[in-house]
């Protein structure tokens, strides 16, 4: 504003000066012109000084106004800041109030829900109270009814009590009477027992004497059994030696026949329609002869056990023990070969076993708690030739059929009869060895009969060298059975002929 006023005041001065300058070179003279210029300059200076003073005053006023405006502006700025701060405070307060309002609304909704639930609970409690009041009325009525029933039961119980009390008094009197009578009977029986003590002692003495007599009988029986077993072992050894010799003779006979008739197998196949492997038979026979020996092992008999009673009058639990040195494999082979023997030997063995079972049952009844004799029989250590003989007799079969009568020479018939005799004796002794190994001791007469019959067959069976033509006698029957067994054993097969 001050600049605008100064520009307005200087504008006429400049215009006058321009007019003087424009006029001076043309019309003025040099002397008058300098004075006029000086006057003009003085005038201009005065006007300028006046204008400067005016401008100073104006400037001072404007400065004062500016200071006042600045102070007002500062106060306005302070007021604006205060108002802004107050506005922020009010906004925060408003937000807190709004949050408080929301919290109060939530509390209000929760309280309204709780009020509704309390109202429902109050209604339910009222209904329950009504039901309880009804049930209380029913309970009171039931109580009155039960009270009446209880009074009736108490009255009946009192009556029963009185009745049973009378009955108990009667029973007590009867019991006292029974005790007195029983006491009298007990005294009578006690007197009788005391009078019978002497008779009991006498009976016990006689029983002990009989028991000692039975012990002596059992000792004698076991001694006889051991003697019989020793005899049997000797016979078995003799028979084994004889069977070995017969087997060697048969092997030599077959070798002689092979040397004399090299085509013997073809002839047998042609005549008998039987396929046979003579080399395998010879090999099995030689193997049996080499592996069988009767000189290495001896017969060992175990003495009879002590049967004297102990201090308390009882016999020891282990009276007889069974000891067998024959291998498990040899025993199984011997049993398998013995099971395929003839029916006559199995029948005799079954009879002896049944007699043995009845004898053992009777002995057990006499002994009381004593162990049976068949379970703990005295063991006999027999030579291993039983299993070897049985296996050799089952493997080294002769290929000839005993029922064919006209197609073979004297040597073949003689070999067949020798083999049948050896097979019969092997079957009998094999069955006896099976019974001995499993603890079955037959009765005395049965064992003696078996030994006698077997020995007579083994010694007298060779007389029928040409008996193959008839089926009579034990040798022919056993030959037929042995041939059937040999057909089943697989050593030779029946050839399939074209005219079957």
Curated annotation (Swiss-Prot):
It is a peripheral membrane protein. One of its GO terms (cellular component) is endoplasmic reticulum membrane. Residues 332-360, 381-406, 468-484 have a biased composition (Low complexity). The keyword Endoplasmic reticulum applies. Residues 1-12, 418-431 have a biased composition (Polar residues). Belongs to the SHE3 family. This is SWI5-dependent HO expression protein 3. The lineage of its organism: Eukaryota, Fungi, Dikarya, Ascomycota, Saccharomycotina.
